[in-house]
Design a protein with these regions (language model features):
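Residue-identity detector for threonine
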Residues: 3, 19, 32, 40-41, ...
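Membrane-interface amphipathic/juxtamembrane segments adjacent to transmembrane helices
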Residues: 26-64, 229
């Protein structure tokens, strides 16, 4: 029963939480009012240049490079290795496997071997630098240790405790096509699989969600059009409030004609 729950029910539960959680965060960010232009300067003035700027932010993190080159180095290589590993794992989700996925296998394999190094760097940076340690929270360390555990268990599966790949692909394809089955899987793969599902559940509710939050950041997705008049969409005409103790007409100067009439 535990095996059935781990390999059949839990994957769908974690995938549902991941999908709904990400959509909920996007919905919250999209409905957040941004009444002012707070774009980071120098800023583009056209929509096309804004899109190009955000693509650059996603691909090579220029803002981080200007602020902290060592952090940029660790973060850049971590993200590159992570994407190569994810692309390599597409072979378990696709049948037949496309040629470009087959071509990524060797590169993704070496990326999996190297990904612990930038993770160790990012973890050491939080522990050694006093300022970073002071502002770090439990979630920061949890995410790093979780990804590290996934990477190490994956390396062990590839090098020392090899699992029959056909059974693994049968498991994944069964989940993808809603025909789940429970093949004979080693305990280490079960641990690796469980850690990935924990990451999926945690992802929408932690700082890892910055991957999608970048597209909703007003400092990056706005144009530098400060000269254009902007009207708040929630503005509405405000009527007279009888409870107002200081109505403006009480203190408004009387017209000259009315003052002269009072003198007569």
């Amino acid at each position: 029963m535990a095996t059935k729950f781990l390999f059949i029910y839990l994957p769908y539960i974690s995938a549902g939480i991941f999908t709904l959680g990400v959509l909920y965060r996007f919905w919250r960010w999209a409905r957040t009012p941004v009444p002012l232009r707070i774009v980071t300067t120098p800023a583009p003035r056209t929509t096309v240049r804004v899109i190009l700027r955000m693509v650059g932010d996603v691909l090579w993190f220029p803002s981080l490079f200007k602020g902290d080159k060592f952090l940029w180095l660790g973060g850049f290589f971590f993200h590159i290795f992570l994407w190569l590993v994810i692309l390599r794992h597409l072979r378990f989700f696709l049948y037949p496997v496309p040629g470009w996925v087959v071509a990524m296998q060797t590169l993704g394999l070496y990326a999996g071997y190297l990904i612990p190094f930038p993770l160790v760097f990012l973890l050491a940076r939080r522990l050694v630098m006093e300022r970073n340690l002071y502002i770090s929270i439990l979630g920061d360390f949890f995410a790093l240790f979780l990804i590290m555990a996934i990477a190490i268990s994956g390396i062990l599966l590839e090098v020392f405790f090899r699992t029959y790949v056909v059974d693994v692909k049968a498991l994944i394809l069964g989940l993808v096509y809603f025909q789940p089955l429970v093949p004979e899987i080693s305990w280490l793969f079960a641990l690796h699989f469980l850690l990935v599902m924990v990451l999926m559940v945690y992802f929408p509710f932690g700082k890892l969600m910055h991957a999608g939050g970048l597209f909703f950041s007003p400092t990056r997705n706005q144009r530098a059009n400060w000269e254009q008049r902007f009207v708040n969409p929630w503005d509405f005409p405000v009527g007279y409030n009888p409870q107002n103790l200081f109505p403006p007409e009480k203190y408004r100067p009387a017209p000259a004609e009315s003052r002269e009439g009072k003198k007569e």
